[in-house]
Amino acid sequence: MVFATDSGVFSRRELDRGTEVLLAALPESVAGPVLDMGCGYGTIGVAVGARWPGLAVTMADVNRRACDLARENARRNGVRAEVLESDGYMALTGRRFATILQNPPIRAGKAVIYRMFADGAASLLPGGRLWLVIRKQQGAPSAMNYLATLFDEVAVVEKKSGYWVLCCAAPHQDTEEATKDV
């Protein structure tokens, strides 16, 4: 795969190690529709769309330039994907996904990423899964504790190079109400 990048987007010089670890940890198949939340220039969404071409893939990011690059990268790599400029889940209201993939923007702060986790839990279809990668030293254990308040199942599926890949399933029934308090 070939990716266009630019200044002002995350990991513009090379594939982020966390993204690489997340993609390698995914199972043999994932269910669609798929959301790449905080897509940046589209690495995760494009890789998933290329690996499973029959899946409906949506990519969302707050950064307009990142969205433009994600569209370009999907086109370059022959992947059909919808790309939305969205502050978190704002442009996705009412949409539901079977799989949500995320390399969260840690530098945005805990309040922002925890809001994204809560909104993700509320945006899953029944049986859906939220997959994310986070470095241990950047808060993976505390993120797991928070995720356990949203999901019945939170598992570490991979630990590699200081990165933890988490898979969360079975959002609590009251997750949509809980997102109002984040």
Question: Model-flagged regions — what are they?
Answer:
Residues 114-126:
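A short glycine-rich, Lys/Arg-flanked "PGG" loop and its adjoining helix->strand segment in the class I
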Residues 135-150:
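Conserved class I S-adenosyl-L-methionine
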Residues 1-13, 174:
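Non-catalytic substrate-recognition/targeting regions of SAM-dependent transferases
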Residues 48, 120-121, 147:
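Class I S-adenosylmethionine-dependent transferase superfamily signal
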